[in-house]
Swiss-Prot record:
Gene3D superfamilies in UniProt: Glycogen Phosphorylase B (3.40.50.2000)
Molecular function in Gene Ontology: glycogen phosphorylase activity; pyridoxal phosphate binding
Organism this protein belongs to: Pongo abelii
Job of this protein: Glycogen phosphorylase that regulates glycogen mobilization. Phosphorylase is an important allosteric enzyme in carbohydrate metabolism. Enzymes from different sources differ in their regulatory mechanisms and in their natural substrates. However, all known phosphorylases share catalytic and structural properties.
Residues the record lists as binding AMP: D43, Y197, R310
Annotated site, May be involved in allosteric control, chain positions: Y156
Name of the protein in question: Glycogen phosphorylase, brain form
Residues under site feature: Involved in the association of subunits: C109, C143
Record PTM N-acetylalanine, positions in chain: A2
Cellular component annotations (GO), alphabetically ordered: cytoplasm
Record carries keyword Phosphoprotein: yes
Length: 843
């Protein structure tokens, strides 16, 4: 008789191995049916389209989960170095389609849903965007997570689970109005709460120096509840984790004040603690020193570092070897990447844990911290740099303030020893800025406390070294690197532009999806008549589809054979949507002046959100909509020029407009845009770029040949020279009649007859204090736009340039970017190892 199984042996039956995957259409249908009835508790008589979406999401998620568990088991066994990407923003967009694409499930799901009498595309459109970011910085983090999973890195994204993401933008009477983005209202099928890993985060209190070391006492505690979202790599069975923290009040919150007798009041006040993760701050490239924001920054850092250290200590390696409780090996097992200065508190927090809690001596702790942390700089705009008042730290994080002072003192002692008597250098390099309000310069803290500092495009990294952190570069040049940004080709080609992806696959196979440099193989096809026709046909189909979408969603009818001239990004003076406006007004005036002349028809689309408190940006939106009101209703103009403001620009709208664009506008003042990634998305999707020599545009021109982009305007050196000389806007206004006419029309109320003074602030800024020198580039921009028109008249030559651009866009994959981070900053190698799927036994 067989020996009875032990409990431990019985438990081996609890395994992901025995669970069927989604091999075929029948299984998808079965799983969909099961989830509709058993998970959502609906039948077809009462199910809503959203129920069908959720049933499909749970079906796809089932397929993910086995791989997710397997991946974590694999990491536990191999114990690789872990990469922790810390960011206050992850702009993920929608998840369903991306998950199906990366798991290779799209065709099976499409067919199953079709067989059930439903439409997959209609279901996909119901899903909310996860809008936990403002723009480029948050979207970069999302692309990076995709690439890290695809490259088999043991990586984790850590951030905040904002209850309300970036606001929804409504346009009312031409003005932006913000609405709360209640993205979790119907639940989120992709996240898994992990209350068992809930962690305390401390605020306020006081510091006591005792013989046993330093104690941070009498703090207020907020709990951080983790929610995990799977991040699937592309067809490699790797599923990484994005862990977002949500704030919860502890059960005894304020109840220690019970003698006050107001139990109800105490429970209601739990909201105060939980407000920490309530809402994303909607500022892009602008620092607003609010205490709640500082709380958010410390909240994510404190929870994440506890989690990192828990994982470090409990790893398999640590069980076998006492070395793990000694932190010497910490930088060999942990890399922390700071996405801008927002998670800068990681540096003093790691020091606090090592010195105060783990009793590591200061110098050793500092060495560990520096080897572990690396910092990515994303902007050179002075108004965007984080400078927190010391008084706020004193109250909120008193121990961290002491640690920052100590870090700064040692740093300044070091600088003083190297540059004796150079007092001004000490002032410039201090973490503490003296003045009426003493401030902590978070960028300086990041540079001092990291072993690597990188910019996000070559030109930006040079500006970082020669200007923003010049003194620090002179001190430690080996620290500074460049890592040109990239985008994931899975979302930004395969998912959003399947027609173009298929056309490319027919010619060069599928390898380019994980090695975008393979697109170079398209270069010999640049004169291939059939390929030229195929590429042009895909673009026309995308334009027709987007035209239909505009008509349905925005009730706007456009001419699909016009040039789609697209300018979509956050609204900011440095991005110069105003330069685009001046071009549009000038074109309008030319049509009115000579209506019989042949014009290349254009549909100009401008989209993007303005920070709610940014008056000028909101006024720019009003100007765009007002110009549209005049131009679009002028019978003389007809179909030749249309101006559309794309309301509520977000990831899911980008996925529609980018594949349809002919012309991509990337026209920031040289030296202002760190990199840009929209520029890369348009390039990969077959739009031509009009742009300045700024950010990644420089490298795009280098890759594709400047003659295959429309480059214009001042370069960084010219901008600097103009600053030294003194920029005088009036000179341009007086000498360029078309510019003068356009500015006068805006100024006089031609576009705002009911409010003639509506745009006086814009004109005043342009004439008297325009930091971004719009007028200085106007003439060159107009000439460049004329070249665009000329080429567009020759569709074949236009498409040849498009093909060259697509073929040369390989550098701009986030896979390449992440490979560089891995090798040159984190000290890990990407892996093309396929983790066995759940139905295959492990080694």
């Amino acid at each position: 008789m067989a020996k009875p199984l032990t409990d431990s042996e019985k438990r081996k039956q609890i395994s992901v191995r025995g669970l069927a995957g989604l091999g075929d259409v029948a299984e998808v249908r079965k799983s969909f049916n099961r989830h509709l009835h058993f998970t959502l508790v609906k039948d077809r008589n009462v199910a809503t389209p959203r129920d069908y979406l959720f049933a499909l999401a749970h079906t796809v998620r089932d397929h993910l989960v086995g791989r997710w568990i397997r991946t974590q088991q694999h990491y536990y066994e191999r114990d690789p170095k872990r990469i922790y990407y810390l960011s206050l923003e992850f702009y993920m967009g929608r998840t369903l389609q991306n998950t199906m694409v990366n798991l290779g499930l799209q065709n099976a799901c499409d067919e199953a849903i079709y067989q059930l009498g439903l439409d997959l595309e209609e279901l996909e459109e119901i899903e909310e965007d996860a809008g936990l970011g403002n723009g480029g910085l948050g979207r970069l983090a999302a692309c990076f997570l995709d690439s890290m999973a695809t490259l088999g890195l043991a990586a984790y994204g850590y951030g905040i689970r904002y209850e309300f993401g970036i606001f929804n933008q409504k346009i009312v009477n031409g003005w932006q109005v913000e609405e709360a983005d209640d993205w979790l209202r119907y639940g989120n099928p992709w996240e898994k709460a992990r209350p068992e890993y809930m962690l305390p985060v401390h605020f306020y209190g006081r510091v006591e120096h005792t013989p046993d070391g330093v104690k941070w006492l009498d703090t207020q505690v907020v709990l951080a509840m983790p929610y995990d979202t799977p991040v699937p790599g592309y067809k490699n069975n790797t599923v990484n984790t994005m862990r977002l923290w949500s704030a919860k009040a502890p059960n005894d919150f304020k109840l220690q004040d019970f003698n006050v007798g107001d139990y109800i009041e105490a429970v209601l006040d739990r909201n105060l603690a939980e407000n920490i993760s309530r809402v994303l701050y909607p500022n892009d490239n602008f620092f607003e020193g609010k205490e709640l924001r500082l709380k958010q920054e410390y909240f994510v850092v404190a929870a994440t570092l506890q989690d990192i250290i828990r994982r470090f200590k409990s790893s398999k390696f640590g069980c076998r070897d006492p070395v793990r409780t000694c932190f010497e090996t910490f930088p060999d097992k942990v890399a922390i990447q700071l996405n801008d200065t927002h998670p800068a508190l990681s540096i003093p927090e790691l020091m606090r844990i090592l010195v105060d809690v783990e009793k590591v001596d200061w110098d050793k702790a500092w060495e560990i911290t520096k080897k572990t942390c690396a910092y990515t700089n994303h902007t050179v705009l002075p108004e965007a740099l984080e400078r927190w008042p010391v008084s706020m730290f004193e109250k909120l994080l008193p121990r961290h303030l002491e640690i920052i002072y100590a870090i700064n003192q040692r740093h300044l002692d070091h600088v003083a020893a190297l540059f004796p008597g150079d007092v001004d250098r000490l002032r410039r390099m201090s973490v503490i800025e003296e003045g009426d309000c003493k401030r902590i310069n978070m960028a300086h803290l990041c540079v001092i406390g990291s072993h690597a500092v990188n910019g996000v495009a070559r030109i930006h990294s040079e500006i970082v070294k020669q200007s923003v952190f010049k003194d620090f570069y002179e001190l430690e040049p080996e620290k500074f690197q460049n890592k040109t940004n990239g985008i994931t080709p899975r979302r930004w080609l395969l998912l959003c532009n399947p027609g173009l992806a298929d056309t490319i696959v027919e010619k060069i196979g599928e390898e380019f999806l994980t090695d975008l440099s393979q697109l170079k193989k398209l270069l010999p096809l640049v004169n291939d008549e059939v390929f030229i026709r195929d590429v042009a046909k895909v673009k026309q189909e995308n334009k027709l589809k987007f035209s239909a979408f505009l008509e349905k969603e925005y009730k706007v009818k456009i001419n699909p054979s016009s040039m789609f001239d697209v300018h979509v990004k956050r609204i900011h003076e440095y991005k110069r949507q105003l330069l685009n406006c001046l071009h549009v007004v000038t074109l309008y005036n030319r049509i009115k002046r000579d209506p019989a002349k042949a014009f290349v028809p254009r549909t100009v689309m401008i989209g993007g959100k303005a920070a709610p408190g940014y008056h000028m940006a909101k006024l720019i939106i009003k100007l765009v909509t007002s110009i549209g009101d005049v131009v679009n209703h002028d019978p003389v103009v007809g179909d030749r020029l249309k101006v559309i403001f794309l309301e509520n620009y977000r990831v899911s709208l980008a996925e529609k407009v980018i594949p349809a664009a002919d012309l991509s506008q990337q026209i920031s003042t040289a030296g202002a845009e760190a990199s840009g990634t929209g520029n890369m998305k348009f390039m990969l999707n077959g739009a031509l770029t009009i742009g300045t020599m700024d950010g990644a545009n420089v490298e795009m021109a280098e890759e594709a040949g400047a003659e295959n982009l429309f480059i214009f305007g001042l370069q960084v050196e010219d901008v600097e020279a103009l600053d030294r000389k003194g920029y005088n806007a009036r000179e341009y206004y007086d000498h360029l009649p078309e510019l003068k006419q356009a500015v006068d029309q805006i100024s006089s109320g031609f576009f705002s007859p009911k409010e003639p003074n509506c745009f006086k602030d814009i004109v005043n800024m342009l004439m008297h204090h325009d930091r971004f020198k719009v007028f200085a580039d106007y003439e060159a921009y107009m000439q460049c736009q004329a070249q665009v028109d000329q080429l567009y008249r020759n569709p074949k030559e236009w498409t040849k340039k498009v093909i060259r651009n697509i073929a040369c866009s390989g550098k701009f994959s986030s896979d390449r970017t992440i490979t560089e981070y891995a090798r040159e900053i984190w000290g890990v190698e990407p892996s093309d190892l396929q983790i066995p799927p759940p139905n295959v036994p492990r080694d």
